[in-house]
């Protein structure tokens, strides 16, 4: 009989969001009259920017003409999109990133998991706590961890607590680690990192031969000009960091699928024989073998983000969600709840009241206000006693959800 990858058996009972869906569906079946508002999973609600839609329509028409039809594209992405990204997202901010170092993909969630393909199994891996669950689960699947303990922490991972005491920015690890996951603006806490914060991490990585996986999926929500949008704004980061970005949240591409990963050509890691190998070459080989590239139509839509019209429309989308976040923060604070994040980020991190556990507060919010959020404990042990609320929803839903919370849960 064929055998399985036993590492999958080490995964906890259910991925966070399917468990939320199970509970919500059970409640909806028992209470069909309830009008449930979902502020849990970070999925966008507003339509694609008009500039992107028009570009995609034009691309569809091109696919219907033999003279302009496109078949397989380059696995790394079309150069015209990579150039626009390099110029607008990196070089404009003083980052020394070339278009050839940018790889277009169908999602940063995929890339943060797939990047492990090019790294060995004996690396020591550090994740923040709380953490986006994908970082942990993909390492479990890849065989980089032992079993989980009673708190849900996996043997072999180094957990870096993010708490109110450290402003939800982790301290440097006390031990040497090889791979470090950082996400700023942070999911789930909404915290941001200053240039000083990131400089400490870059210096640590260079001193220890570590690689930073920097998830910048929410950088478009930064409005404070003093905060870095990219880790490559920090001197030396080209030699120690891989950055992941996405069009999902700034341009509404969650259902369209387009993202990018930056692997500088100066970035190296060691082979088992001690020689240094360029990671760009390995990632390029991995993508060429396992990925056929993002649809031409979608890439034309992403390119339109960088047009004058596209930039204005994307900014309007981002501002819409940031205003939602402000409403959530203001209304929940009025209700007597302690809130973090929601500024320079689309997530609000709420301290659960009355000593309730994260899942107990989830159930209370669902049952009394018919509002769905995300239990903080689903993001790690340090998330217990917290709750994530997403600003990705319609204004009507955000205002109604916060009205219900004030009515039902005012502390």
From Swiss-Prot:
Bridged cysteine pairs (disulfide): none
Under Pfam families, the record lists: Aminotran_1_2
Which molecular-function annotation in GO is an example for this chain?
L,L-diaminopimelate aminotransferase activity
Catalytic activity from the UniProt record:
(2S,6S)-2,6-diaminopimelate + 2-oxoglutarate = (S)-2,3,4,5-tetrahydrodipicolinate + L-glutamate + H2O + H(+)
The UniProt entry, under InterPro entries, shows: Aminotransferase_I/II_large, DapL/ALD1, PyrdxlP-dep_Trfase, PyrdxlP-dep_Trfase_major, PyrdxlP-dep_Trfase_small
Provide the cofactor list for this protein.
pyridoxal 5'-phosphate
Instruction: Name the top EC class.
Output: transferase
Write the Enzyme Commission number(s) for this entry: 2.6.1.83
**Where does the secretion signal sit in this chain?**
none
Q: Does the keyword Hydrolase apply?
A: no
Q: Name one GO biological process term.
A: lysine biosynthetic process via diaminopimelate, diaminopimelate-aminotransferase pathway
Top-rank taxon:
Bacteria
Annotated positions of the N6-(pyridoxal phosphate)lysine modification = 249
**What pathway or pathways are given for this protein in its record?**
Amino-acid biosynthesis; L-lysine biosynthesis via DAP pathway; LL-2,6-diaminopimelate from (S)-tetrahydrodipicolinate (aminotransferase route): step 1/1
Q: Does the keyword Transferase apply?
A: yes
The residues listed in the UniProt record as binding pyridoxal 5'-phosphate, with positions renumbered to this chain, are: 72, 108-109, 132, 187, 218, 246-248, 257, 292
Query: Where, in this chain's numbering, is substrate bound?
Result: 15, 42, 109, 132, 187, 292, 388
**Keywords attached to this entry:** Aminotransferase, Pyridoxal phosphate, Transferase
Output the Gene3D superfamilies linked to this UniProt entry.
Aspartate Aminotransferase, domain 1, Type I PLP-dependent aspartate aminotransferase-like (Major domain)
**Subunit architecture:** Homodimer.
Cited function: Involved in the synthesis of meso-diaminopimelate (m-DAP or DL-DAP), required for both lysine and peptidoglycan biosynthesis. Catalyzes the direct conversion of tetrahydrodipicolinate to LL-diaminopimelate.
Query: Member of which family?
Result: Belongs to the class-I pyridoxal-phosphate-dependent aminotransferase family. LL-diaminopimelate aminotransferase subfamily.
Protein name per Swiss-Prot or TrEMBL: LL-diaminopimelate aminotransferase
Give the classification, highest ranks.
Answer: Bacteria, Bacillati, Cyanobacteriota, Cyanophyceae, Oscillatoriophycideae
> What gene name does this entry carry?
dapL
């Amino acid at each position: 009989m064929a055998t399985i990858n036993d590492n999958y058996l080490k995964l906890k009972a259910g991925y966070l969001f399917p468990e939320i869906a199970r509970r919500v569906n059970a409640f909806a079946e028992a209470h069909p009259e309830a009008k449930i508002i979902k502020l849990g999973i970070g999925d966008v609600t507003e339509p694609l920017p008009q500039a992107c839609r028009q570009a995609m329509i034009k691309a569809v028409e091109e696919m219907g003409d033999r003279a302009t039809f496109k078949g397989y594209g380059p696995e790394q992405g079309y150069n015209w999109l990579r150039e626009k990204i390099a110029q607008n997202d990196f070089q404009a901010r003083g980052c020394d990133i070339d278009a050839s170092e940018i790889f277009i993909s169908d999602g940063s969630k995929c890339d943060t998991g797939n990047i492990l393909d090019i790294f060995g199994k004996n690396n020591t891996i550090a994740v923040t706590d709380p953490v986006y669950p994908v970082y942990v689960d993909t390492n479990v699947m890849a065989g980089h961890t032992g079993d989980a303990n009673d708190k849900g922490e996996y043997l072999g991972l180094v957990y870096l607590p993010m708490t109110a005491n450290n402003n939800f920015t982790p301290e440097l690890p006390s031990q040497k680690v090889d791979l470090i996951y950082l996400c700023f603006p942070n999911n789930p806490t909404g915290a941001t990192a200053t240039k000083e914060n990131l400089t400490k991490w870059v210096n640590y990585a260079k001193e220890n031969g570590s690689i930073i996986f920097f998830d910048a999926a929410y950088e478009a929500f930064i409005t404070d000009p003093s905060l870095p949008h990219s880790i490559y704004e920090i001197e030396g980061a080209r030699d120690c960091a891989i950055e992941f970005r996405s069009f999902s949240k700034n341009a509404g591409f969650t259902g369209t699928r387009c993202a990018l990963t930056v692997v500088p050509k100066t970035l190296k890691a060691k082979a088992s024989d001690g020689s240094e190998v360029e990671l760009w070459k390995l990632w390029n080989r991995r993508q060429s073998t396992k990925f056929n590239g993002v649809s031409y139509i979608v890439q034309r839509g992403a390119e339109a983000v960088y047009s004058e019209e596209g930039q204005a429309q994307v900014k309007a989308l981002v501002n819409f969600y940031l205003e939602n976040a402000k409403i959530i923060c203001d209304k929940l604070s009025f209700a007597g709840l302690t809130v973090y994040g929601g500024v320079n980020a689309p997530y609000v991190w709420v301290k659960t009241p009355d000593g309730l556990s994260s899942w107990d507060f989830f159930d209370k919010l669902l049952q009394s206000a018919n509002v769905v959020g995300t239990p903080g404990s689903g993001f790690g042990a340090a998330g217990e006693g917290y709750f994530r609320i997403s600003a990705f929803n319609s204004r009507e839903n955000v205002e109604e959800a916060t009205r219900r919370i004030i009515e039902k849960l005012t502390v």
